[in-house]
Regions:
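Conserved active-site and SAM-binding loop architecture
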Residues: 1-123
């Protein structure tokens, strides 16, 4: 499978897919923390490739409910809507297998409820 790991610079998830024999590419604005296939740049540059699976870890800075007290300012400066639009790049992608990791946030209201909720204490 061709797997894109978007907004991922640790290389951990990419390396797990590579170890299983998949073709995997991590992509982030930051350089990869480990050697391996990594595109340092805007994910939009590689999003149109024929991926079999996309796992995205978009920044939660402007989307999480823990920052609700700053939502008014984020609406006014546009960062809330920019974060939501970036999230939707993945949600609307035609790839059949898309997973988006994000904490509980405003996307449950703006987009839809998540298919799964996984808590860190479960692992």
């Amino acid at each position: 499978m061709r797997v894109l790991l978007a907004c991922e610079c640790s290389g951990a998830v990419r390396d797990a897919f590579l170890a299983l024999g998949h073709e995997a590419l991590s992509c982030d604005l930051q350089p990869s923390e480990t050697p391996g296939p990594h595109y340092q740049g805007d994910v939009r540059d590689v999003l149109a490739f024929p991926w079999d699976m996309i796992i995205a870890f978009p920044p939660c800075t402007d989307l999480t409910v823990s920052g609700a007290r700053w939502h008014k300012a984020k609406r006014e400066n546009g960062s809330l809507y920019a974060g939501a639009a970036f999230f939707m790049l993945f949600a609307n992608h035609p790839c059949q297998r898309v997973a988006i990791e994000n904490p509980v946030g405003i996307m449950s209201s703006l987009y839809r409820k998540p298919d799964q909720v996984i808590q860190p204490w479960q692992f």
